[in-house]
Amino acid sequence: MRTLNVALGDRSYPIHIGAGLLARPELIVPLLRTPRVAIVTNTVVGPLYLERLTAGLESHGIAVSTVVLPDGEAHKDWTTLNRIFDMLLESRCERSTTLLALGGGVVGDMGGFAAATYQRGMPFMQIPTTLLSQVDSSVGGKTAINHPLGKNMIGAFYQPRLVLADIEVLNTLPDRELSAGLAEVIKYGLIRDPAFYAWLEENIERLRARDPEALAYAIERSCRNKAEVVAADETEQGERALLNLGHTFGHAIETGMGYGEWLHGEAVAAGTMMAAELSRALGWLTDDDVNRIEALFVRAGLPVRAPALGIERYLELMAHDKKVESGRLRLVLLASIGKALMFGDATAGEIGAAISRRCG
């Protein structure tokens, strides 16, 4: 097992990475305020892992309440969130009860948001079961639900007390979901870790083959990058915004196509290619750089072209982005492979041209 620490003073917490961690309730139990938990999972993950987690906790004298949500981004909304609140209230969970989010990014985001708001805040822990959630969404305290006008528009920063990343659960992850997670792994190399990017170019096939050593290394390296950024900028006032490379374009794809049609990682990959096109047009990336980025996404099984929603529709959707400031769209772009920057002076024409080069 490998352990990292997210350094946030008295709200610091560990990230445990390894095989078989779901069968180790002793990693969870000492961090509970009271011997009671509420587990949030979904219809895909629950049948695979809920009984194992519940049995382990109950063997340590922990009382367990559960709710099983419908699966998918299309259900990341108020209606589904209220099912969590219903379970918490009907089970008479208290502010000291710990909520465990067992699932991918949707479960983690909604479970975390429920924990942040139930009785004004209850402790929670992340038990991510997809590659994307293990390397990105479970770390850093971003919680949210979607709105018809934009992704993750209603939420809160609320840190977990523990992240438990069991790499064995990735063996049941569909290939498409694994590739989607690789988009966020590649992102860390692009924005701040060129040596890791070079490693990925050498080892991407090992990751797709689910080589346990390669996966453990990539997850640890990704989480280390994320933890360093979050410790320096928890609420995204500066450097943390760079973690959103490809996300402004990508969220437009997800919203425009309808939540769940494109996986988040797929949209991030296509969105990153749009950001790379704009970075090339501004004179920062070379043709070789863009070709390297495209080649790695393709080898990872990810799309490098986006749906043809129309330039005006893209710009309309991007206007709702959380990085818009004083009406100005600020984009995360690449100065080079391994170095990202925030740029707010791109014209609508320049942005539209970058989009058009990657549409259809």
Swiss-Prot record:
Its main location: cytoplasm. One of its GO terms (molecular function) is metal ion binding. Zn(2+) binds at residues 184, 247, 264. Keywords: Amino-acid biosynthesis, Aromatic amino acid biosynthesis, Cobalt, Cytoplasm, Lyase, Metal-binding, NAD, Nucleotide-binding, Zinc. It holds the Pfam family DHQS_C. GO terms for cellular component: cytoplasm. Catalyzes the conversion of 3-deoxy-D-arabino-heptulosonate 7-phosphate (DAHP) to dehydroquinate (DHQ). Belongs to the sugar phosphate cyclases superfamily. Dehydroquinate synthase family. This is 3-dehydroquinate synthase.
